Amino acid sequence: FGKSMVLHREPVAAIRKYVDEMGLETTIMYDMAHVLGLTGDHFQKPFQEGAEIVTGSTHKTFFGPQRGIVGVNYKKGELKYGLWETIESRAFPGSVSNHHLGTQLGLLMAAYEMNQFKDAYQAAVVSNAKSFAKSLKAAGLDVAGDPAIDYTETHQVIVNVGYGAG
């Protein structure tokens, strides 16, 4: 899962249920780059819904410096925990050549702020996007999404302007 334009929750629970019913040995990964700051009661809880790996960006709806995160829902001793160990050992040093220590304090402060204010922040972000979408529609614009839920479940609003016209 994961994409740049996100109006709705991803069907993580439905996919988890399907692969489990089919007996498929699979790993569900959810790239939450654009919606990481909405994770929780106001949007989606991917680990509780069945995702095993979550990646994200700390500079979009999570309002910190430009960094990335990887988290897993594996416990030490489980067979798939080896996947986490591989990811962890190859991230730094390895694929990442600079861990940018100068941004870590900013990320820490953003994390503290998110922990303190996330409920109000997340609710406001989604509410503002819904209000914006309704206002655009009322002004005559072609707003994408389901009007029954005010067009969006996230921070994003999409306006159809025509192919290659926007």
Each PLM stretch: what is its role?
Residues F1-D142, V161:
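Conserved PLP-enzyme active-site core in the AAT-like
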Residues V143-G166:
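Conserved PLP-binding catalytic core of the aspartate aminotransferase-like
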